[in-house]
């Protein structure tokens, strides 16, 4: 039976894990690291780079290097967070069928397609490590991701060639990894602050049960926002000193982002750091350099309100769970941004107790996802995972009111229905507007989609009975149906979310990903062939030089001709493996005479060595 991989598809970094021989372990990538930067780059040569290699060239290729794609996953173009993303990100965020996408060199890519490229790398790294093909996966999402974002994540997995067995919440996965071996029931709080998202979840673990009691968060709050505070400060300081606004310089902004991220990390252990960016820009007076000292106290002042938001959310979630802080036995810290000292101090102060930092914040979510995969496959027995829906779901009713059908915090999977009627006499159709959120009016909540139920028999208003049913699966993905109870006519919709991708489009993207895989393999094969050819050229030239006149003129001429042919092919960067191999074979054949000459040279050297008179040897007998 093929193995199931657990994937933490993060905003900043991603991680993949597998459950084998009774434990879940992180799979290192081909570069030997346990996490892979969630960065995808498109080069001028048509190459697609993923991970560390993509991140390294970001400064010189800012408009075609995509990072933090998770922040626009399932995001509508008219949402507030979309406007902020467009203003912040150096690459082009554009509208595609009402949803956010990115434009690179004139081509539009959905967040699902970009995320799929990250997933493909994780899949290939897992296959290289395990030595077998991998298809099945469990992928994690922030607990506060809405239906659109969950659906988009699952679509990314499909495009990457994965069979997504389950979408599970990141804090739940972390709790699964942390609490699986706990025998006694205990209530824990998982504080998960990553690169772009924040979740807080209260769970009860013990005796192989992990039950979510309440969850909350902010899908647009994380380490990126800490970085942005530093960037804004640097831009402001530099403008005050030089009069130059760096916000219009994409390459400078990319350098500022890298510097801000590094400064944030350094301030986790140091009280002060220096940000030194020579030649950040230039004006008529010459080049300009940016050199600033940033203290931990200054940085903490910048992010204090953001950290404060997370503490407020902790209080709300504990209240939703019907608990008090004294009921929480452990506070488990998850996500790379929990390394920031102020975060740890404020959470510790909120509970008045030491925090549990026993889990690796970058790896624990993927480890939990792999455990969930093993549960689904039956490799781990008797484990029950009870998750909840993070936001209420309902429909728009008369007066623009949101009528909730499934309340937030309901354990999933679940199915609930409610009967509604018409608002006007002789109304023969109704439009069902599906909403997600906690506000009283429809306009203030997120619209997930709509559909029509037609053919309702003419009747006075309030007489027809229309049953609306909401069905949430274990992935937290919603299907809505409406049925006229008098006629039995029904209509349903699986909410496709704001991704706007049809099944045909997803299938097309799957094929496109496969095509790129073939192209990448051809390119890799060509690189390997080129390296071998370069080595042959070097060796042949070296041998020709060493043998000199010992190579007959005709043979030398043939070898030089084949050598020049191979060099010409190598000059063309678009040469295929087959073209290079053909010229390598021709040079190898022509070089046979070289091998013969080298052999004769070695033979003669050996013979001369054997005939050397032993002038320094004295014959003697040893008693």
From Swiss-Prot:
Chain positions with Phosphothreonine modification: 197
GO molecular function terms noted in the UniProt entry: ATP binding; ATP-dependent protein folding chaperone; unfolded protein binding
Chain coiled-coil ranges: none
Keywords noted in UniProt: ATP-binding, Chaperone, Nucleotide-binding, Phosphoprotein, Stress response
Disulphide-bonded residues: none
Renumbered residue ranges of the record's region Disordered: 600-623
Induction: By stress conditions e.g. heat shock.
HAMAP family named in the record: DnaK
Family: Belongs to the heat shock protein 70 family.
NCBIfam families noted in UniProt: PRK00290.1, prok_dnaK
Functional description taken from the UniProt entry: Acts as a chaperone.
UniProt name for this protein: Chaperone protein DnaK
Species whose genome carries this gene: Campylobacter concisus (strain 13826)
